[in-house]
């Protein structure tokens, strides 16, 4: 409202929208304190109203259209500072540390991932494991993508960084690289930081699972003398051979997290029962909970897999369970048909 620029708050489609998590919800009174009511009044004043008639969206010729398009520049230039101001207010209230770009990892990291979206939680688990074993790795999380503030990105990258892998959850065929990768390369080039090697990768298209093994593979690639400039993770690309080799990964979930996996048949009630179970645990205990349900578009009659986690610590594991503490198979024929139960 204060910035007077339209916003799109986006997240990783199915992976995030269909996940059940315990979250903290703000009270409306707290939200009201965050809102600049003068800015709200100014916003409403510009709404279509018969008491204040105005004409918009009719026709504009080429003699003035370009000038009008450039006239909005000051609003976009000021927007990152407005966002940062409100992030500061949130941090003050909740004790968080939201920035336009947040760094996570070793303070002297030499290998850094830059990404946004669900892979950031997976990367945090991997970074915790690797730094505990003496590795100098880290990650920059992007919270405000547009307008892109290059100076804030550069200040978030450790001075010791030598190599960067940028991960995009999109594919732009025919381009030199995906959008975030191109933004990072441009920001570094404009700042004269040509000594940092940058590679770009794709992950998670169509909610493809991105397990810790994929993130380990990215850091392994950054350790090589000859790196793939463009790569994919989470799949085996036997056509263009862009995928990175992924090795079995150690368990990196928070200590004490219980992981349960349920195999079922679409329409047999397995998914519904598990949704109720995880909600009961979340509503009536102090446990952190997470549930994600894997099924195809056929739904009824197809294979379903329910992934349930709960524990005493926040759960960052935005990927399928591959080392379950408990497994249930509600369709006996799955066992003899080669499913990886």
Question: Regions from the language model: what does each represent?
Answer:
Residues 140-160, 167-168, 309-322, 326-341:
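Hydrophobic alpha-helical bundle architecture
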Residues 88-111, 124, 243-257:
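Glycine-/acidic-rich phosphate or pyrophosphate-binding loops and their flanking alpha/beta elements
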Residues 107-108, 112-143, 256-323, 327:
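Anionic-ligand anchoring segments at beta-strand to alpha-helix junctions in alpha/beta enzyme folds, i.e.
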Residues 12, 18-25, 124-126, 151-152, ...:
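Short acidic, glycine/serine/threonine-rich loops at helix termini
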Residues 4-102:
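Conformationally flexible catalytic loops at phosphate/diphosphate-handling active centers
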Residues 11-18, 117, 171, 203-207, ...:
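Glycine-rich beta-alpha junction loops
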